[in-house]
């Protein structure tokens, strides 16, 4: 073998035998640091860059439910696009004023002279539906998102003050990643 090849092989072996400096140890993560302002942001960026892929994130509740649902699926089940065979015997037609659902049966007028109260009921029912549609999804959604962003903002402000005045571990800062 040539001397150059042996030296290159030795150099390559020495590089591989060196411990990786990019590895994150538990001691490094548990070390308490005091950082304020820009140093706090830089520390978060450094910690997030160093810990990418280090620890698997905890399983979320949604994934657990998906796994539970998939375990109940039968492989020999029929596809959902087929309709079950219904009996060919036609059902007896109900009179037009006769309610078929139990929810409708509780609002049936007692006598024929109470038709006015039925009309009042219909008007009030449609009015309450309109009110329910007025406070619909976009307003509630923005309210929900506002509370989430507010919680995240307060949490990050609290963490920055804690890291500045009392100190915090790098592991606690990984929650911001």
Swiss-Prot record:
Pfam families named in the record: Insulin (PF00049)
Entries under CDD domains matching the protein: IlGF_relaxin_like
Keyword ATP-binding set for record: no
Main location: secreted
UniProt keyword list: Cleavage on pair of basic residues, Disulfide bond, Hormone, Secreted, Signal
Record's subcellular location: Secreted
SUPFAM superfamilies registered for this protein in UniProt: Insulin-like
Region (Disordered): 80-114
Signal peptide: 1-22
CC annotations in GO: extracellular region
Family matches, as InterPro entries: Insulin-like, Insulin-like_sf, Insulin_CS, Relaxin, Repro_Hormone_Insulin-like
Disulfide bond annotation, renumbered to this chain: 36-164, 48-177, 163-168
UniProt subunit comment: Heterodimer of a B chain and an A chain linked by two disulfide bonds.
Similarity section: Belongs to the insulin family.
Protein name, entry field: Prorelaxin
Lineage: Eukaryota, Metazoa, Chordata, Craniata, Vertebrata
């Amino acid at each position: 073998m040539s001397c150059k090849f042996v030296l290159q092989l030795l150099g390559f072996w020495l590089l591989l035998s060196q411990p990786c400096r990019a590895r994150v140890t538990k001691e490094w993560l548990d070390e308490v640091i005091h950082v304020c302002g820009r140093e706090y942001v830089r520390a978060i960026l450094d910690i997030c860059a160093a810990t990418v892929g280090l620890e698997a994130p905890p399983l979320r509740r949604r994934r657990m439910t998906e796994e539970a649902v998939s375990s109940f699926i039968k492989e020999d089940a029929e596809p959902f696009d087929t309709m079950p065979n219904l009996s060919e015997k036609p059902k007896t037609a109900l009179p037009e004023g006769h309610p078929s659902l139990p929810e409708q049966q509780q609002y049936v007028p007692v006598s024929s002279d109470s038709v006015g109260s039925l009309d009042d009921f219909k008007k009030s029912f449609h009015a309450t539906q309109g009110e329910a549609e007025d406070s619909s999804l976009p307003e509630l959604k923005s309210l929900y998102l506002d509370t989430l962003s507010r919680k995240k903002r307060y949490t990050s402000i609290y963490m920055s003050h804690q890291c500045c005045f009392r100190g915090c571990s790098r592991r606690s800062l990984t929650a911001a990643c």
